[in-house]
Regions:
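PRPP-associated nucleotide enzymes
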Residues: 1-257
């Protein structure tokens, strides 16, 4: 049920898609109702965009859910806004979505939070994919950064190589990443940092998924784990409301590929 009068209005439906299977059908119902009641435009604001990590057919017979879900969203909504989607194998959202998209980046907010809450940080990217992240955050607040090297062995086993960080033992390592899900990479990285005699690290992520027992496994390994409120979680300390509101009010959209 929609409260208010959508006739002649732009309707933005806001729902972070942490549990997309039950949530998406409700969004379809709401979007359909808004159109029937005269909305000019119906848009989806999804701070966390589901299914993006299934970006290829990892095993025979699997669905590439990122593509399927993109078709569903594109056929239901006029525009899509999200924060730091997983774009490992896609250059932009427009490679998947046929509607206008807005991709927001939380790295500046993470950087500002770290600057205000961590003394003498060393920004650490847990794998090669995070190199741009770690570098941009470190550059924004004028601190050093390092990037670890990850080798995966199946879905739940990883090896990590850590460069010599002894010159920065007086600093607090801050592991930064876009998504914390299984937590395996973060856990191995924390152990490797401890082996080098580093201070107990902090962890700052955008999307706090923490599947299964990841949260209970990770909390003893870090001095503190912090996330944005893209996904509701006890670790939320960084709000995205102003970032999202600014993009909505300005009409910001991604360039088309």
């Amino acid at each position: 049920r929609l409260h208010g009068e959508p006739v002649g209005q732009i309707v933005d439906l806001i729902c972070t898609l942490t549990h997309p299977d039950p949530q998406f059908l409700l969004l379809v119902f709401a979007a359909d109702a808004a159109r029937e009641l005269g909305a000019l435009e119906v848009n989806l604001v999804a701070p966390y965009l589901a299914y993006m990590r299934q970006d290829k057919r990892f095993h025979d017979g699997e669905s590439v859910t990122s593509r399927t879900f993109a078709r569903l969203v594109s056929s239901t909504f006029d525009k899509l806004l999200t924060v730091d989607p997983h774009l490992h194998r896609y250059p932009t959202l427009s490679a998947l979505y046929t509607i206008p998209t807005t991709t927001l980046h939380a790295a500046p907010l993470l950087a500002d939070w770290i600057a205000n809450h961590v003394e003498k940080p060393l920004i650490v990217g847990p794998d090669e994919e995070s190199e741009q992240w770690a570098g941009s955050i470190a550059s924004r607040i004028g601190v050093p950064h390092a990037v670890l090297r990850k080798t995966r062995h199946g879905d739940r086993s990883v090896d990590i190589d850590v460069p010599d960080l002894s010159v920065w033992r007086d600093r607090t390592p801050v592991l930064v990443d876009d998504i914390a899900s299984s937590g395996r990479t973060l856990a191995v990285a924390a152990h490797k940092l401890a082996e080098q005699g580093m201070r107990k690290p902090e962890c700052v992520v955008v999307h706090a998924l923490f599947a299964e027992d990841a949260w209970s496994q990770l909390t003893p390994l870090f001095a503190r784990i912090t996330s944005t409120d893209a996904v509701p979680h006890p670790s939320n300390r960084i709000g995205l409301a102003s970032l999202i509101a600014g993009a909505l009010s300005s009409g910001q959209t991604d360039p088309r590929a």
